[in-house]
Amino acid sequence: MSRYRGPRVKIIRRLGALPGLTNKTLKLKSGYINQSTSNKKVSQYRIRLEEKQKLRFHYGLTERQLLKYVRIARKAKGSTGQVLLQLLEMRLDNIIFRLGMAPTIPGARQLVNHRHILINNNTVDIPSYNCKPKDVITIKDRSKSQSIIIKNLNSFQKQKIPNHLTFDLMQIKGLVNQIIDREWIYLKINELLVVEYYSRQV
């Protein structure tokens, strides 16, 4: 299944707020009832499916990519669900988003693909690059790169930067301090349900 490129409002209307996908929010009219769930008994499968979809759309992954991360998480030590979230949060495109250098994860992915981003002074154009503690994230010293990032920072750096990251606004430089803690993953998600959804596929 390919990466979703359709209307983003349609997705958040069904799944709720997904800040990685879009910074838009829905204002529901008074008395609004979600027709997809009203007066219906929701199956356990559907509940797990929707949690999985939240994760996939928030981080902008294909089905194959998400399944790959689940398999990696299952082989690692610790809680599979927590390891899965940590793997996704430490992706370069997500780190750029969490630093406020892009309004959304798709926007961050575009910055990486267009070679605006440096990791430890080396150009990295792979959005799925796994960031590690002590990685230093900067931008290329060229006017186009500078203007894009500065515009994004002025517009979108409103939320608090999580404690596993540090950002120097004057130098436009980010630092990965550590692997993210679960409490700093602000997406409303039950990762256990995602793991259960994939239990027969891994």
From Swiss-Prot:
CDD domains the record matches: S4
Gene Ontology BP, a term: translation
Keywords: Chloroplast, Plastid, Ribonucleoprotein, Ribosomal protein, RNA-binding, rRNA-binding
Top-level taxon in the UniProt lineage: Eukaryota
SMART domains: Ribosomal_S4, S4
Gene3D superfamilies: Ribosomal Protein S4 Delta 41, Chain A, domain 1 (1.10.1050.10), RNA-binding S4 domain (3.10.290.10)
UniProt GO cellular component terms: chloroplast; small ribosomal subunit
Location of the S4 RNA-binding domain: 90-154
GO molecular function, one term: structural constituent of ribosome
Pfam families referenced in this protein's UniProt entry, alphabetically: Ribosomal_S4, S4
InterPro entries found in the cross-reference section: Ribosomal_uS4, Ribosomal_uS4_bac-type, Ribosomal_uS4_CS, Ribosomal_uS4_N, S4_RNA-bd, S4_RNA-bd_sf
Protein localization: Plastid, Chloroplast
Function: One of the primary rRNA binding proteins, it binds directly to 16S rRNA where it nucleates assembly of the body of the 30S subunit.
Protein family: Belongs to the universal ribosomal protein uS4 family.
Quaternary structure annotation from Swiss-Prot or TrEMBL: Part of the 30S ribosomal subunit. Contacts protein S5. The interaction surface between S4 and S5 is involved in control of translational fidelity.
Annotated PANTHER family: 30S 40S RIBOSOMAL PROTEIN, SMALL RIBOSOMAL SUBUNIT PROTEIN US4M
Name this polypeptide is given: Small ribosomal subunit protein uS4c
